[in-house]
Amino acid sequence: MRVETLFDVLDSDFYTGVPDSQLQALCNFLIDKYGISEHHVIAANEGNCTALAAGHYLATGNVPVVYMQNSGIGNIIKPVASLLNDKVYAIPCIFVVGWRGEPGIHDEPQHIYQGEVTLKLLEDMDIATFVIGKETTEAELYAKMKEFRNVLTNGKSVAFVVRKGALEYGNKVVYSNEYQMKREEVLEHIVAVTENDPIVSTTGKASRELFEIRERNGQGHE
């Protein structure tokens, strides 16, 4: 499905999220359309995004969109339970969630269990869900969004859970910044100082690079 279709269906003027490779099409589209602006905010974590979304709704009355990888669901539990839920302030929000570790789909080890519990976690937070796959049609998406509008009107949140390869975007975005060092170079400097001291790092590429640097240096991983 073209990501432009999803954008039209969601019909929101405010997006905030944490970039995810599974949602690369959406991330690239938003950078092309909005850049980093009052319409598109990239935050440090998914909880921050949800709080920003709540503030946007309270200020404008417009339903916001929060996008993220499913590994960030744990970070939204507190703001969803304490701010968004219809038993609290009834702030509606649309979540777009990249589904890593989907059962039956090969993925990295850290995504396996998260993928298994993704839909159940959203259900436990009283967030209605719809899974978008390669086979999902435009008509199905519009019909589900029409149903979701009634849910949002009642102050509840909804989530579109996106399978691998479900979204497409034709333009290629070249990312750049003015930082002088790449992440791997920063890690190399940290390892040089800490030597054999234990290091706790986030899952994903940072940990893989840290592992490779320590391997190259003949250091252990205990």
What is the meaning of each model-derived region?
Residues 1-120, 127, 131-155, 159-222:
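Thiamine diphosphate
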